[in-house]
């Protein structure tokens, strides 16, 4: 059921039905390599950043902010007009990845991440 459900709602970004989100001009087309996933992250969130510039009513919400500052969740609820008391325990986990990776690509990702954070709502 889970696999069918994920197909029905269009999730193919990982798992058995994985399809590359950004297939053009890849430096790392092999999905078994860590750099492939890093590159896909970069290409996906680069598009997200471009959308946030293009559309005024586009809000980025940093998960780390949700985890580290309960006021962020209150601000999100206020923005959406949610008056109901809903409590979520957002928990940030930090995983040390013991993989080798392309340092230039990693640096590009980090700079993009910093740009996303600087445009995040609710900080």
Positions of predicted regions on the chain:
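PAPS-dependent sulfotransferases, especially Golgi type II membrane carbohydrate sulfotransferases
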Residues: 2-123
């Amino acid at each position: 059921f889970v696999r069918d459900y994920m197909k029905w709602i269009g999730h193919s970004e990982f798992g058995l039905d994985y399809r590359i989100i950004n297939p053009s001009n890849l430096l790392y087309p092999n999905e078994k390599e860590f750099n492939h996933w890093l590159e896909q992250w970069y290409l996906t969130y680069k598009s997200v950043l471009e959308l946030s510039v293009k559309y005024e009513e586009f809000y980025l919400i940093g998960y780390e902010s949700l985890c580290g500052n309960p006021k962020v969740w209150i601000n999100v609820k206020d923005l959406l007009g949610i008056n109901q008391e809903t409590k979520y325990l957002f928990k940030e986990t930090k995983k040390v990845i013991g993989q080798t990776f392309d340092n230039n690509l990693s640096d590009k990702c980090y700079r993009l991440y910093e740009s996303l954070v600087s445009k995040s709502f609710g900080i």
